[in-house]
């Protein structure tokens, strides 16, 4: 099994826009090697009789019925804003025509 080289760590660090010193390079090389060893162990597991899944547990959505409600607090809400025009908030223009 090949070990992670310093050059490989530097390449990954460069892609991630990280600047690593020599100690950090050695540390990351060791950590990446441990991760790859773990993956190699997982690859040896026989999963032929295990059904494919997308999640470890079943996820169920709980829906509620939408209900329309009339709101009488529009004026109160508009008063909270810094600026308004009629029944709308007034905001600074950000798009030039």
UniProtKB/Swiss-Prot annotation:
GO terms for biological process: glutaminyl-tRNAGln biosynthesis via transamidation; regulation of translational fidelity; translation. Pfam families: GatC. Keywords: ATP-binding, Ligase, Nucleotide-binding, Protein biosynthesis. The keyword Acyltransferase does not apply. It comes from the Bacteria. GO terms for molecular function: asparaginyl-tRNA synthase (glutamine-hydrolyzing) activity; ATP binding; glutaminyl-tRNA synthase (glutamine-hydrolyzing) activity. It is an enzyme of class 6 (ligase). The keyword ATP-binding applies. Its EC number is 6.3.5.-. Belongs to the GatC family. HAMAP family: GatC. Heterotrimer of A, B and C subunits. Allows the formation of correctly charged Asn-tRNA(Asn) or Gln-tRNA(Gln) through the transamidation of misacylated Asp-tRNA(Asn) or Glu-tRNA(Gln) in organisms which lack either or both of asparaginyl-tRNA or glutaminyl-tRNA synthetases. The reaction takes place in the presence of glutamine and ATP through an activated phospho-Asp-tRNA(Asn) or phospho-Glu-tRNA(Gln). This is Aspartyl/glutamyl-tRNA(Asn/Gln) amidotransferase subunit C. It comes from Prochlorococcus marinus (strain MIT 9301).
């Amino acid at each position: 099994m090949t070990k992670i080289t310093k050059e490989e760590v530097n390449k990954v660090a460069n892609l991630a826009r990280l600047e690593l010193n020599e100690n950090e390079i050695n540390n990351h090389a060791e950590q990446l090697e441990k991760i790859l060893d773990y993956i190699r162990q997982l690859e040896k597991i026989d999963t032929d009789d295990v059904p494919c899944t997308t999640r470890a547990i079943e996820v169920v959505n709980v829906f509620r019925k939408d209900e329309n409600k009339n709101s009488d607090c529009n004026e109160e809400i508009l008063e909270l804003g810094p600026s308004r025009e009629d029944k709308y908030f007034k905001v600074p223009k950000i798009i030039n025509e």
